[in-house]
Regions:
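Conserved acidic residues
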Residues: 13, 113-115, 181, 234-235
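Glycine-centered short loops/turns at secondary-structure junctions
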Residues: 27, 195-197, 227
Length: 250
């Protein structure tokens, strides 16, 4: 098979998937490569895993509310390992679905990394370390971004980005979430509904700064109702690990 394509896409997340399907529908020969998981951040570390976890916490919270209207359900318990298995299964199904969409569209799929060596050439290396050079008339870079870690903050098992928080093995007794955009707010709701003490810190004067102000205000009230300690207009000055936990300075 020829190693020349009309379009090579580096990154199999939402942007790469949409571009590959559209270009293939236009009759172009497409190669898309992905090193970390089909569907990208949304599928593996963002929208889909958070929604899977929120479905669990919402169900637990709903069971507790039934008692208020006279419906007894026994003592509700939390099996966090089972919640994680549910999350992983949902993510697996979504990733397989993303890959199938590409295959059904006639897009050539490559798992591995891509190294750009010229405006039209890429070295594609698969997980086994085997490489080949591919060329294209056009190149789309859609490899996404990484979470920003404030200067002076070192990541560890207890200090992590949003990429890592969804993969922790045990439910914490308390958690500090720095950043009140949609991912931070989703995790604040999830942990609060499971009874975790949550502190949500935002540098700007309101949560969800990119969303409608009235909606953000309503959601803040809901967070407070859940017991979340919401602190806006608060700059993170430092984090330190101690034997007792993580200490935050704002």
């Amino acid at each position: 098979m020829s190693d020349r394509y009309d379009l090579i896409i580096v990154g199999g997340g939402p942007a790469g998937l949409a571009a590959a399907q559209a270009a293939s529908a236009a009759g172009k020969r497409i190669l898309i490569m992905e090193k970390d998981g089909w569907g990208g951040t949304c599928t593996h570390r963002g929208c889909i895993p958070t929604k899977a976890l929120l479905a669990c916490s919402r169900s637990y919270s709903g069971l507790k509310k039934l008692r208020r209207v006279g419906i007894g359900t026994g003592e509700a318990t939390i099996d966090y390992a089972a919640m994680r298995r549910h999350q992983q299964q949902i993510v697996k199904i979504a990733a397989l679905g993303a890959r199938k969409l590409l295959a059904d569209a006639g897009v050539e799929i490559a798992e591995g990394t891509g190294e750009i060596i010229s405006p039209r050439e890429i070295i594609c290396t698969n997980p086994a370390g085997e490489s080949r050079t591919v060329t294209a008339d056009h190149l789309l870079i859609a490899w996404g971004s990484e979470a920003v870690v404030p200067r002076g903050i070192s990541l560890s098992e207890r200090i992590m980005t949003s990429d890592g928080i969804g993969a922790i093995d045990d439910l914490p007794a308390s958690i500090i979430i720095v950043g009140a955009s949609f991912i931070g707010v989703e995790y604040a709701v999830f942990f609060a509904q499971l009874g975790v003490k949550v502190i949500l810190v935002e540098l700007l004067e309101r949560i969800l700064p990119q969303e409608d102000e009235e909606a953000a205000q309503f959601l803040r009230q809901e967070l407070v109702r859940l017991g979340v300690d919401v602190r806006t207009g608060a700059a993170l000055a430092g984090l330190a690990e101690t034997p007792a936990g993580v200490v935050m300075e704002v």
